[in-house]
């Protein structure tokens, strides 16, 4: 019985087996909505074509993390394609566009039409930067966007279906003991899976406590997350540590 979507469950507990079960239930529902399956793909390209799919090619944390990856791809060996399935472009969209061989805004397209466009562009590897977060296009990958489909960065949980071949992670995000709870094969990056920008600009503005109506002497605790992630178990753990 389906009782919750996969994404919010990630913040409610760290039971990877439950995460897999919920992801599989959600994926099964998505699969049932797809007709005319075809896993036949194009012949090999001269250069490998990598398609990055994201609703966050804009001023968004995923955008800031992935930017240098897109910038530093060896363009002599790879053609890089961008598929933006988010609702609104901004100045960061303009910045990232120049790092793609081709860039498509596919927000108005259906999941199945996005898969068709990817096939028409003969994408060899589809990298999903969204997972089950907002504006996800799960059915694109069930339909088949590329011969190889990878879950990376935006959603560090399993997609729970056989249509994703790999998840890019590290031994902290997915330790070997948890491989059984991932439908994908796990590809490890050394040290840390999370890409980042090498030249992040740090604000030079000095903030004062009074700007935020904070007392001058008290210790200030901060949690820079959505408040739904602060549940009784998490809060009790903080109190125990303190």
Which residues does each predicted region cover?
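Substrate-binding clefts and catalytic carboxylate motifs of secreted carbohydrate-active enzymes
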Residues: 222-233
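Alpha-helical solenoid repeat scaffolds of the TPR/TPR-like class and their adjacent stem/linker regions
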Residues: 1-214, 226, 236
């Amino acid at each position: 019985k389906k009782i919750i979507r996969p994404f919010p469950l990630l913040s409610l507990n760290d039971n990877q087996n439950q995460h897999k079960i919920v992801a599989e239930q959600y994926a099964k529902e998505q699969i049932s909505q797809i007709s005319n399956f075809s896993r036949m793909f194009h012949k090999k390209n001269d250069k490998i074509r990598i398609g990055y799919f994201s609703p966050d090619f804009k001023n968004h944390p995923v955008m800031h993390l992935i930017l240098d990856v897109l910038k530093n791809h060896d363009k002599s060996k790879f053609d890089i394609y961008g598929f933006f399935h988010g609702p609104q472009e901004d100045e960061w969209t303009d910045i990232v566009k120049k790092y793609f061989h081709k860039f498509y805004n596919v927000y108005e397209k259906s999941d199945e039409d996005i898969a068709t466009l990817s096939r028409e562009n003969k994408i060899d590897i589809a990298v999903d930067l969204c997972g089950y977060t907002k504006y996800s296009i799960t059915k694109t990958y069930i339909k088949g966007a590329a011969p190889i489909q990878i879950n990376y960065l935006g959603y560090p949980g399993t997609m729970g279906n056989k249509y994703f071949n790999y998840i890019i992670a590290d031994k902290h995000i997915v330790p070997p003991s948890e491989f059984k709870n991932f439908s994908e094969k796990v590809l490890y990056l050394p040290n840390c899976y999370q890409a980042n920008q090498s030249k992040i600009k740090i604000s030079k503005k000095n903030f004062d406590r009074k700007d935020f109506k904070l007392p001058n002497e008290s210790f200030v605790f901060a949690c820079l997350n959505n408040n739904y992630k602060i549940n009784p178990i998490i809060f009790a753990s903080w109190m125990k540590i303190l």
